[in-house]
């Protein structure tokens, strides 16, 4: 298992004379698993300049989506100490991001990241992770590992799409069991477009 802050990318192979239009950044697979790491927060911009003469003043647009998950008990109680850990799978995430256009492409994959309990165990959550954009209504799955070895699993499609530049908070309520902005040099980064999704998981 890995930390919520882990992020990785598969860099393109750059070949002299090859067009960047034909290259892409890719997801990096978690070793000995079928899922992938979250990615780094990526921005994109173009500007025609004279190298060595013009200053870079490009307007940067976010090329990734941010996702945060907050899991609570429906009744507001603390989660049981019998819960060992929780983690999230988010599916239907594009596998690649074109290096030239920053457009998502390729097949769809599943991203995995962990949830951490707060001090009073009233919620399990993560810092926002970055992912490549998704297809509409991606599937989210929550896994609850019990200390007795049992593994509970719930899944549901989101009502929102993880598009580039969106910052989505998913609130999961169970029966029973935010980002800095600013500039870098002469670059201005677009603000996140924030959205929310709520899921209620009934006790079975």
Name each model-derived stretch:
Residues 27, 31-32, 162-175:
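Low-complexity, Pro/Ser/Thr- and charge-rich linker/hinge segments at domain boundaries
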Residues 1-12, 79-166, 197-204:
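Tryptophan-paired
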Residues 61-74:
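A short, Gly/Thr-enriched small/hydrophobic beta-strand-prone motif that recurs across taxa
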Residues 53-55, 66, 125-127, 167:
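Intrinsic-disorder/low-complexity, polar/charged segments enriched in Ser/Thr/Lys/Arg/Asp/Glu/Gln
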Residues 56-57, 76-78:
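Short helix-to-loop capping/linker segments positioned immediately adjacent to catalytic or ligand/cofactor-binding
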Residues 1-64:
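Short, low-hydrophobicity acidic/polar segments
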Residues 56, 67, 140-142, 170:
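Hydrophobic residues positioned within well-ordered beta-strands of beta-sheet architectures
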Residues 176-204:
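Intrinsically disordered, low-complexity repeat and linker tracts
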